[in-house]
């Protein structure tokens, strides 16, 4: 009993400190010092949340910039994806993230890349095959990457300008204004947030 009592007290104290006090303190500090980041780095337009700058979205409209390839289609689905097959399975498996995980010699990887190249060239007829930036043809580890390289954004501008009626110079300024530089000038890569640039495009088009 003498050894059981201290062990029980320690367990209760640790439970309160680690399970209640510590999380509450961290939550309080984060809400005061980093409120925006602590709440998911949400992007709001006219008081309405349109997404997070940390999670990519699927854009199919020719007037908007496209993100990277996603093995989970940026976790979006259609009504058809919810229709079960003869075995009762649906195309949409619930909230998910991840990559294709194809090996370099896997024929499915080659086929997927070729299809993506052909689609991109069809949507961007002024672009040459060899000029397509690599990140537009490769999937991120999560399949939810919100960013593309400045080169990937720039190469889409002519087609977007034609579809939207927005001048190429104005689109380039939108890209420049939403480009984040390398951390400390050396860590990571310059990147463009796809949702942010598309929000600006939508504003010019009067959609939001």
Swiss-Prot record:
Residues passing through the membrane, by range: 6-26
GO molecular function terms listed in the Swiss-Prot or TrEMBL record: ATP binding; P-type potassium transmembrane transporter activity
Alphabetically ordered keywords of this record: ATP-binding, Cell membrane, Ion transport, Membrane, Nucleotide-binding, Potassium, Potassium transport, Transmembrane, Transmembrane helix, Transport
Subcellular location: Cell membrane
GO CC, alphabetical: plasma membrane
Broad class of where this protein is predominantly found: membrane
One Pfam family hit: KdpC
The keyword Ion transport appears for this protein: yes
Topology term for the membrane: Single-pass membrane protein
Listed InterPro entries: KdpC (IPR003820)
Lineage top rank: taxon: Bacteria
Function per UniProt: Part of the high-affinity ATP-driven potassium transport (or Kdp) system, which catalyzes the hydrolysis of ATP coupled with the electrogenic transport of potassium into the cytoplasm. This subunit acts as a catalytic chaperone that increases the ATP-binding affinity of the ATP-hydrolyzing subunit KdpB by the formation of a transient KdpB/KdpC/ATP ternary complex.
The protein's assembly and partners: The system is composed of three essential subunits: KdpA, KdpB and KdpC.
Family: Belongs to the KdpC family.
NCBIfam families xref list: kdpC, PRK13995.1
HAMAP family noted in UniProt: KdpC (MF_00276)
Name of the protein in its database record: Potassium-transporting ATPase KdpC subunit
Organism: Clostridioides difficile (strain 630) (Peptoclostridium difficile)
């Amino acid at each position: 009993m003498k050894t059981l009592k201290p062990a029980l007290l320690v367990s209760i104290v640790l439970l309160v400190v680690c399970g209640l006090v510590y999380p509450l303190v961290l939550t309080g500090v984060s809400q005061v010092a980093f409120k925006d980041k602590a709440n998911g780095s949400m992007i709001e337009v006219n008081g309405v949340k349109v997404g997070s700058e940390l999670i990519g979205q699927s854009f199919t409209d020719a007037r908007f910039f496209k993100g990277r390839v996603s093995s989970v289609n940026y976790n979006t689905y259609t009504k058809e994806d919810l229709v079960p097959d003869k075995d009762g399975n649906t195309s949409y498996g619930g909230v998910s993230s991840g990559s294709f995980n194809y090996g370099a010699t896997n024929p499915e990887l080659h086929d997927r890349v070729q299809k993506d190249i052909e689609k991109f060239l069809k949507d961007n007829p002024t672009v040459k095959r060899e000029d397509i930036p690599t990140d537009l043809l490769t999937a991120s580890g999560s399949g939810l990457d919100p960013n593309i390289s400045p080169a990937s954004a720039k190469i889409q501008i002519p087609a977007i300008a034609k579809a939207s009626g927005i001048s190429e110079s104005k689109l380039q300024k939108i890209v420049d204004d939403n480009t984040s530089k390398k951390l400390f000038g050396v860590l990571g890569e310059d990147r463009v947030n796809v949702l942010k640039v598309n929000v600006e495009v939508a504003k010019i088009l009067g959609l939001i």
